[in-house]
Amino acid sequence: MTIAFQLAVFALIATSSILLISVPVVFASPDGWLGNKNVVFSGTSLWITLVFLVGILNSLIS
């Protein structure tokens, strides 16, 4: 269970870092939002899912 928690936290940190870089780039590009809207929404959905997963796993471990 601890390994799953650690992997979920690592995935959350990695996803946060990727979104931190990619979202401003998408908004700054001239046609970026219309072309990459689905990618941004998918990344955001993954991030929200990971936040809840880390919270649930944290409550099970402690």
UniProtKB/Swiss-Prot annotation:
**Where is it localised?**
Plastid, Chloroplast thylakoid membrane
Which membrane topology term applies here?
Answer: Multi-pass membrane protein
Spans traversing the lipid bilayer: 8-28, 41-61
**Entry-linked Pfam families:** Ycf9
Q: What is its main location?
A: plastid
InterPro entries, sorted: PSII_PsbZ (IPR002644), PSII_PsbZ_sf (IPR036512)
Q: Does the keyword S-adenosyl-L-methionine apply?
A: no
Q: Which HAMAP family match?
A: PSII_PsbZ
On subunit structure and binding partners, the annotation says: PSII is composed of 1 copy each of membrane proteins PsbA, PsbB, PsbC, PsbD, PsbE, PsbF, PsbH, PsbI, PsbJ, PsbK, PsbL, PsbM, PsbT, PsbY, PsbZ, Psb30/Ycf12, at least 3 peripheral proteins of the oxygen-evolving complex and a large number of cofactors. It forms dimeric complexes.
| Family of this protein | Belongs to the PsbZ family.
* Designated name of the protein: Photosystem II reaction center protein Z
